[in-house]
Amino acid sequence: MSDIVLEFATDLKTILGQNLSKIILYGSYARMDYDASSDVDLMVLVTLSDEEIKKVENQVFDCAFELEMKYGVDISPIIKNERHYEYWVDTLPFYRNIQKEGVVVA
């Protein structure tokens, strides 16, 4: 699994460059209670606006799909503006959960 995450992180650095702030692994892989049907959940935090995210999200999803085909494991990236995430992290249960259980991988 670490190979997938590292390869995905490397690809994202190429796609997003300095706009990539952080990649957080969360969910069953972060908790270490995954099984064969588990996907790799990743929160991708960027310094891009929502409009700019829409322009690059297909590249990110294509990258995830290529790695899914290579490794046979589903990758589920969510791309959010870092400021948006930080603003809501103490309010929204989903973001609180990522903050609590997540592992920063890049």
Regions from the PLM with identified roles:
Residues D41-L45:
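Short beta-strand->loop micro-motif that forms the acidic, two-metal-ion catalytic signature
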